Amino acid sequence: MYNMMETDLKPPAPQQASGGNSNSGSNNQSKNSPDRVKRPMNAFMVWSRGQRRKMAQENPKMHNSEISKRLGAEWKLLSEAEKRPFIDEAKRLRALHMKEHPDYKYRPRRKTKTLMKKDKYTLPGGLLAPGANPMTSGVGASLGAGVNQRMDTYAHMNGWTNGGYGMMQEQLGYPQHPGLSAHNAPQMQPMHRYDVSALQYNSMSSSQTYMNGSPTYSMSYSQQGAPGMSLGSMGSVVKSESSSSPPVVTSSSHSRAPCQAGDLRDMISMYLPGAEVPEPAAQSRLHMSQHYQSASVAGTAINGTLPLSHM
C-alpha cells in the first residue's frame, strides 16, 4: 500500500519541473522571437559593433561590461568628422526601419531594481544621515534615550508631568544644567545646600527639586525651620530660640511633607528679608544659616541637636 502511494506521489514532481522549464523557455522565446521588433541602431552601436568584436578577440578574458566602458570612453574622444560616417549610417538604418515597421512604437521594458547592499541594511524611514556610521549613530541614539529616560524619571519624582520640567526651567530660569541634576545629584548636594541656605530662592522649581532630590538635605532644611522662623519674626530672640532643640525628622515622609504649595510659599517667604526686619538682623540670619549649613555638611549634629558654638 505504501509503495503504491509513493508511486502515485512521485510523478507530479518532474511534471512541475518540466512546467517551470516550459515557462522559462516561453519567456526566452518571447524575448528572442523573430516577431519582436528591435530598435534601430544608433551611431555608437554601429561603430561599436566592429570595435567590440575586435576588442573581445584581443582580450578574451575581459568582461563585456568592461569592454562597453572602454568603448564608450573611446567614442567620446572621437571628433565629429570621425563620427560623421557612423551617424549617416544610423540615419539610413532608422529610415529603413520606419519603412519596414511603420506602426512601430518603442515601449521600454520595466526592469526590477535590485537593492544594493548599502540600501538593504539602512534603517527604515531614512533615520541615518547620509555618510553616517550605523554603529556610532546607534550608540548615540541609545545614550540619548537613556538621558531622556532619566529626565522623565526625575520629572515624575518632582511631581511634574513629562515636559513640565523643561517649561518650568525655561520660565523660572533654573541655573543648573538639567542633564547633571539627575545623574550627579550626590556630587552636587553641597552646592545645593550653599545656594539655598546662604542665598535666596530663585524659583519654586529649584526649591521643589531640592526638597525631593535629597532626603539628607530635607532633614537639615527642616531642622533650620525653627531658628529661621524666629529670626524672621524678631531679631532679638535669636539666642533663646536657637538654644531650644529643633524637631528631629525620622522618616522620609516627614521630609516630603513640606512640599505642599502653601507651606512652600511660607518657607520661601521665611528666607526673604522683610521690610520690617533691620539690616543687622538679616546679616545675622545669613551668618546663622551658613553656620547650620556647615554643621549639617560636616556631620557635627548629634542626636538631631545643633551645636551652640555660635553663641
Curated annotation (Swiss-Prot):
Stretches the record annotates as Disordered: 1-40, 232-259
Low complexity bias spans: 15-32, 233-255
Disulfide bonds: none
Record GO cellular component, one term: cytoplasm
Gene3D superfamilies for this protein: High mobility group box domain
Cell location: Nucleus
Sequence intervals crossing the membrane: none
Matches recorded under InterPro entries: HMG_box_dom, HMG_box_dom_sf, SOX_fam, SRY-related_HMG-box_TF-like
Alphabetical UniProt keywords: Activator, Developmental protein, Differentiation, DNA-binding, Neurogenesis, Nucleus, Transcription, Transcription regulation
Motif (9aaTAD): 266-274
Domain notes: The 9aaTAD motif is a transactivation domain present in a large number of yeast and animal transcription factors.
Record protein name field: Transcription factor Sox-2
Species for this entry: Xenopus tropicalis
